[in-house]
């Protein structure tokens, strides 16, 4: 493993779960029946642990990174959209016209768009666009590794640097978002490799496939797993990410690792972002305590994924857009959880009698 990457991972402190009891005691002393705010209480308690017991809890400033990259596997016919849509959507993000732009504005969340691996040369200069291209797309995972180990490590380090910059700007929460035509295919392959799932069980329509086209996508993923089997079986999670992933997926995995390094809560978006989280978790298990799955993706295989991860997403809205949209919505819930912890009165403060034990 790259020395710089190893040094970041070695510097990550696991979340102190021993603080959970103190957090719950405080929540139980607020003017409400115990547990009556449900998962908001769980969120607040986890944020308290991430903060090391420091109060008040803070989620803001919050920032979503929508990271873009192209995929060689697009040539295998696994998406109904042409590959140039990746580049077109990056321009749409920069100009404020996409779903993630609207939801970040609604939620009061900062948005940064990142070209990590799009085909073509530089984009026109734009204040909303970070241009740090690691490479121009990947090779087809159905024919060999998506990228070299060196390229994958560069993408991971890019993601780590994005988290570092967010922390330097005072952010307390970051979110993952993606853009890359065909990226449900490498994401599915990563789930199969990391979690032992079967492509036939978790491959879905992505951006709109149906019937025979989905079955073809399953076969492409099977070929990818077979041609890269020697890499996967060697058990190195970074090498597996290089073989089966994408540049934006690796960058998002680095963002997760970097968030943990800087003690930031990290909100994970949908199907693709959860693949990036899974890679980060395999590379460094301690990142898990900092991460929150924002929503249950409508991709049919996502339930099997979260079951394998033993995780519980926050929202169930039938979303399957990506871009970070679910993360932006979940950040509002996290802000609400922090405010409850910080601002609700205790029974003693309010002069309210507690329930009998």
UniProtKB/Swiss-Prot annotation:
Question: Which reactions fall under this protein's catalytic activity?
Answer: 5,6-dimethylbenzimidazole + nicotinate beta-D-ribonucleotide = alpha-ribazole 5'-phosphate + nicotinate + H(+)
What the entry lists under Gene3D superfamilies is as follows: 1.10.1610.10, 3.40.50.10210
Keywords for this protein:
Cobalamin biosynthesis, Glycosyltransferase, Transferase
Annotated GO molecular function terms are: nicotinate-nucleotide-dimethylbenzimidazole phosphoribosyltransferase activity
The lineage's top-level taxon is Bacteria
Q: What is its EC number?
A: 2.4.2.21
Keyword Thylakoid belongs to the record: no
Q: What is this protein called?
A: Nicotinate-nucleotide--dimethylbenzimidazole phosphoribosyltransferase
What organism does the UniProt record list as the source? Nitratidesulfovibrio vulgaris (strain ATCC 29579 / DSM 644 / CCUG 34227 / NCIMB 8303 / VKM B-1760 / Hildenborough)
